[in-house]
Amino acid sequence: MVKSHIGSWILVLFVAMWSDVGLCKKRPKPGGGWNTGGSRYPGQGSPGGNRYPPQGGGGWGQPHGGGWGQPHGGGWGQPHGGGWGQPHGGGGWGQGGTHSQWNKPSKPKTNMKHVAGAAAAGAVVGGLGGYMLGSAMNRPLIHFGNDYEDRYYRENMYRYPNQVYYRPVDQYNNQNTFVHDCVNITVKQHTVTTTTKGENFTETDIKMMERVVEQMCITQYQRESQAYYQRGASVILFSSPPVILLISFLIFLIVG
């Protein structure tokens, strides 16, 4: 009796296991089958996915949610949601929507070498043999000894330069040679430039211009001399043996 019950239970378990295996074989795999998103070639594309996965709810002939002949949700002849001749997102002809605008010329890239070269050149003026152009100054108030010239200067001072040309101060022995060279090149350059524009200077203009430029050249020399001595003092300070020893000790403490 007991043996018959054991045999019955074994038979029931065998049938149950066989049925479960059969159901597993018949159950469709997720995303498999023809036109169900499964990959017929597992070696191509991601595992379990189709080479061309559907993008949202389209029926037969309606991939990506569009109607017949309307891929990606666009109308007839409107691929990717754009109008006729407007591919990929509704951009106008030659715009390309969200894709690259092939019809638009690319912006020129800034050449950093040119920028750095211009910054390093500073105020060096081309065509004047290494002269530099100083910063703009207010034209000085000068009295020429008589009312006529004083009035003439006030009425025409805007015609005279407010910047001077000069060389570095270390190329001169003293202030007088610097100022003399500065006045000559500045007056000459301003006269030539203004004459080419159709404006001429009288002897009175030249006299007043030389006085004005002389005062500005003296101011420019004082500025350049002060800056030159400050740079020299900094070099001497940092090149002295005690300072070098102190800096080396600090670097040793930081690195160590």
UniProtKB/Swiss-Prot annotation:
Lineage top rank: taxon: Eukaryota
Ranges of biased composition (kind: Gly residues): 55-97
InterPro entries: Prion (IPR000817), Prion/Doppel_b-ribbon_dom_sf (IPR036924), Prion/Doppel_prot_b-ribbon_dom (IPR022416), Prion_copper_b_octapeptide (IPR020949), Prion_N (IPR025860)
Glycosylation sites: 184, 200
Record's keyword annotation contains Metal-binding: yes
Segments for region (Disordered): 28-110
Residues that bind Cu(2+) 4: 88, 90-91
GO molecular-function terms, A-Z: copper ion binding
Annotated spans, 5 X 8 AA tandem repeats of P-H-G-G-G-W-G-Q: 54-95
Region described as Interaction with GRB2, ERI3 and SYN1: 25-233
Record bears the keyword Cell membrane: yes
GO biological process: protein homooligomerization
Key words, A-Z: Amyloid, Cell membrane, Copper, Disulfide bond, Glycoprotein, Golgi apparatus, GPI-anchor, Lipoprotein, Membrane, Metal-binding, Prion, Repeat, Signal, Zinc
Segments annotated as Sequence repeats: 54-62, 63-70, 71-78, 79-86, 87-95
Role summary: Its primary physiological function is unclear. Has cytoprotective activity against internal or environmental stresses. May play a role in neuronal development and synaptic plasticity. May be required for neuronal myelin sheath maintenance. May play a role in iron uptake and iron homeostasis. Soluble oligomers are toxic to cultured neuroblastoma cells and induce apoptosis (in vitro). Association with GPC1 (via its heparan sulfate chains) targets PRNP to lipid rafts. Also provides Cu(2+) or Zn(2+) for the ascorbate-mediated GPC1 deaminase degradation of its heparan sulfate side chains.
Oligomer and partners: Monomer and homodimer. Has a tendency to aggregate into amyloid fibrils containing a cross-beta spine, formed by a steric zipper of superposed beta-strands. Soluble oligomers may represent an intermediate stage on the path to fibril formation. Copper binding may promote oligomerization. Interacts with GRB2, APP, ERI3/PRNPIP and SYN1. Mislocalized cytosolically exposed PrP interacts with MGRN1; this interaction alters MGRN1 subcellular location and causes lysosomal enlargement. Interacts with KIAA1191.
Domains: entry comment: The normal, monomeric form has a mainly alpha-helical structure. The disease-associated, protease-resistant form forms amyloid fibrils containing a cross-beta spine, formed by a steric zipper of superposed beta-strands. Disease mutations may favor intermolecular contacts via short beta strands, and may thereby trigger oligomerization.
Protein name: Major prion protein
Species of origin: Odocoileus hemionus (Mule deer)
